[in-house]
């Protein structure tokens, strides 16, 4: 597994940047830049850089966007390019680039402190990885942002929405009469914590699961994942690595005959959560136990469910 040292260095510097904005905290994990008393009407959810905002991270903010829309705010999303379809399909206004003149408040993650520290707009930075969070992440963001904005306490849906009209024209490799396990053994942000031992555990598990269920295995991943991986996977029935887009992955995971997921804790896992399907997860870990405990308790999944054993089992 290739380790992105530059990415990890940026994450370390970001932790230092957070220390310098602690004085502007409005909650244990939320910080406000450029506080003013102007009436807030338009809100931008800003996270356009993949290195700082992976695909799965986008999903955590959709329930907040949904809640703000319901509260009468004009919501715009600035996601990474490959996630624009997700928000557009759900009816949100998507902003690829440009000025912020028509925006009253920017909401983003602390990972974007450097990008926005010179902004003249009000910016609400959220530390979504804080072990101080004591609720499921989607619920927590809605509750705290709602309190900041002085919104009335109305009901909300903390489960990220799933687009309806995704299309399966790029999934012609599927046999709709068969049942499938989706398998992904790649990680981005956790690569420094994942090695050959973890790969063996994951591969041994899915081999046994395939025999036990009789399901076919679809191997997913990017073009880069496939190019950097010389292993031969004799248990894989369909190698879809590099053959599908992020949108296609959403479509794949939504199908009725795609029943199980085996992966690290990433996008694929969260898509299965959203469809109330079972994932077998090899946790990529965290350096500190309190951070690992937080992720397992409040991010996997990021919303409350009373049937957690039906959607996740750790390997």
What spans do the regions from the language model cover?
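A nucleotide-sugar donor-handling region in carbohydrate enzymes
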Residues: 21, 128-180, 187
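Structural motif
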Residues: 104-105, 180, 260
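Conserved donor-binding/catalytic core segment of Leloir-type glycosyltransferases
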Residues: 42-47, 176-192
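N-terminal pre-catalytic "stem/leader" segment of glycosyltransferase-like enzymes
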Residues: 2-92
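Extended, non-globular alpha-helical segments
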Residues: 33-37, 221-248, 294-315
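Secretory-pathway glycan-assembly enzymes, especially type II membrane glycosyltransferases
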Residues: 61, 67-154
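Conserved catalytic-core segment of nucleotide-activated headgroup transferases in glycan assembly
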Residues: 54-64, 71, 188-219
């Amino acid at each position: 597994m290739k380790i992105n040292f530059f990415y990890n260095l940026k994450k370390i510097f970001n932790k230092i940047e957070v220390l310098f904005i602690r004085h502007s905290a409005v909650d244990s994990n939320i910080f406000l830049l450029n506080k003013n008393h102007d009436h807030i009407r338009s809100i931008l959810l800003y996270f356009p850089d993949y290195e700082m905002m992976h695909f799965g991270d986008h999903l955590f903010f959709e329930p907040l966007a949904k809640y703000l829309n319901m509260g009468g705010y004009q919501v715009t999303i600035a996601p990474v390019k490959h996630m624009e379809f997700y928000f557009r399909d759900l009816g949100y206004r998507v902003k690829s680039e440009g000025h912020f003149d028509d925006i009253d408040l920017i909401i983003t993650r602390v990972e974007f402190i450097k990008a926005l520290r010179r902004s003249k707009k009000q910016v609400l930075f959220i530390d979504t990885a804080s072990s101080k969070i004591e609720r499921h992440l989607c619920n927590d963001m809605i509750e705290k942002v709602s309190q900041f904005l002085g919104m009335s306490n109305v009901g909300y849906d903390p489960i990220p929405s799933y687009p309806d009209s995704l299309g399966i024209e790029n999934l012609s490799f599927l046999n709709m009469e068969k049942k499938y396990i989706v398998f992904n053994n790649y990680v981005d942000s956790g690569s420094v914590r994942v090695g050959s031992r973890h790969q063996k555990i994951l591969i041994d598990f899915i081999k046994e699961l395939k025999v036990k269920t009789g399901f076919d295995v679809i191997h997913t991943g990017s073009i880069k994942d496939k190019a950097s991986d010389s292993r031969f996977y004799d248990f894989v029935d369909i190698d879809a690595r590099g053959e599908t887009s992020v949108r296609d992955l959403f479509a794949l995971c939504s199908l009725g005959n795609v029943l199980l997921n085996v992966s690290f804790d990433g996008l694929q896992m969260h898509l299965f959560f959203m469809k109330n399907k079972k994932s077998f997860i090899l946790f990529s870990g965290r350096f500190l136990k309190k951070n690992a405990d937080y992720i397992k308790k409040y991010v996997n999944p990021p919303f409350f469910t009373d049937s957690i054993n039906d959607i996740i089992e750790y390997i």
